Amino acid sequence: MQRFTRRFLSACVVSGVLASAGASAETHPTIRAMSGAVPVSQLPAGKTALLVIDFQNEYFTGKMPIPDGPAALANARKLIEFADEHKMPVYHVRHIAPAGSPVFAIDGETVKFHPDMQPRAKDPVLQKTTVSVFGSTDLDKRLKAAGIENVIVSGLMTHACVAGAARDAAPLSYNVLVAADASATRAITRVNGESTDKDALHQAALAEIEDTFGDVMNTAEIIKLPVR
């Protein structure tokens, strides 16, 4: 009986390992992959722009602090250096709300850009009132006038304004590349009391983007892409 029990338990362990291996080997390709989309391998010179979205005090010292905000900002600065090296335009985006609003109030301090992310004189600055920068600015008109076909997207928050920009850029015929670690978000507690932590929300947003709207890479991968 003991011998049978040992053999039975051993068989269960082996079955469990095999089942686990099978589960881990299972893949769920993105819609873009199934449609034949090829991951970006280079960026076209003169046709690529960098979007730097909402690196504002609200997300650092305001009512919506993002723990990974400083790291995302540091990586966005690396992307700006990369853009400068290859003469890519850098568009800074700032979200604004009416005076007296709880967040991003135009007459408050937290609506201002973070001290370490100040637009230069040469950088266009767009002020938006919608989640997506394309919804309340003339960004599309500006990009098309400049001959831009590819946009690198960075900013805060991943699930909102970054995903919104990617979602709107794709049907406007832009090739979208989101910088995963130059973006970040915060944990959210819903009205029903359920909470989603920042990492789960960040990863879910990136998965949504990669599924249907564009490529997702880390900053180190992006700055290694040839520009030609």
How should these model regions be labeled?
Residues 55:
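Active-site-proximal loop/short-helix segments
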Residues 2-6, 24-49, 77-86, 98, ...:
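Active-site-adjacent betaalpha module
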Residues 10-19:
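Bacterial N-terminal signal peptides
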